[in-house]
Amino acid sequence: MTVSVEATVNIFLYILMNNIAPVFILIFLGFILGKKFKLDIYSFSKIIFFIYVPALAFVKLYETKIEAEHLKALLYAVIYLAVLVTFSTLFSRLRKHSTALGGAFQNSILLYNSANFGLPLITLVFKDSPYAAFAVSLQIMVLLVQNISTNTIGLFNAGRSRLNIGESLKTILKMPAIYTIAAALLLKCVPLDLTKTFVWPAIVYLKDGMVSMALVTLGIQLSKTKFEFKHVEVYLATFARLLIGPALAFVTIYLMNIHGIMAQVLLISSSVPTAVNAALIAVELDNEKDFSSQVVMTTTLLSAVTLTVVIYLSTILFKV
């Protein structure tokens, strides 16, 4: 697949109008609500982590048919995650971050928006390609790894500043998403089509509400955030997620000898902005909330430019 200059411009405009604009509209609504009313951000956080996140994880896992050809993409997502964990840990130590900031900094790099940003983006980029369905299925593999890492590594990073290892593990085990992931995997082996039962529509309704609820909650959090435009760590985290992240992805893809459409999908997928969940986790565990919220906003805004470049480069670096 090759992308012309006109197509690149169209992709840029699409990202701006269909990904960036809707995201910021919902964030802005939450911001206005947070300024106008006295809202408890922790109540919203509890609703998201105990209802919406488990529903999203369950539906995505249950609906995804994992076949042999997807295992390489799954393996890539795990290896790339390990690379990001290693890089972000070393970078954080180099900057001599506190435990709290170090955890938030690491989450801002290794937790990326593979769901409500990455999935529609991959759908758009490959929609006119004969590999469209394959591309989306690969993205779902990445999404599964990110879902699991968010509810394990992400929670651990955010909680370790004020909790010991045992307490951090207890916090992780209290999150229902861990159990819904296990339940989804087990139910896939049972000769019962859950999508035909009366329970399924309710779960889907919750899954569909996850994105809007998360973004409005982020807006409420931002309304209570003191912005520090001189916060160097925000810009370093943004640089790491949007520029170093794709570079590390390219090296990983090259070393794993991945080519063609799969290489294009994985490079683009690994270049998306910091996940909203990074900010929500920070709110839930009261860990560097302002920093995390600012990184989500900054990376989301600037990704309209960086992603356009990555998409174009992917067609040059990995021919089909």
Task: Give residue ranges: language-model regions.
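Alpha-helical transmembrane segments of multi-pass small-molecule/ion transporters
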Residues: 1-320
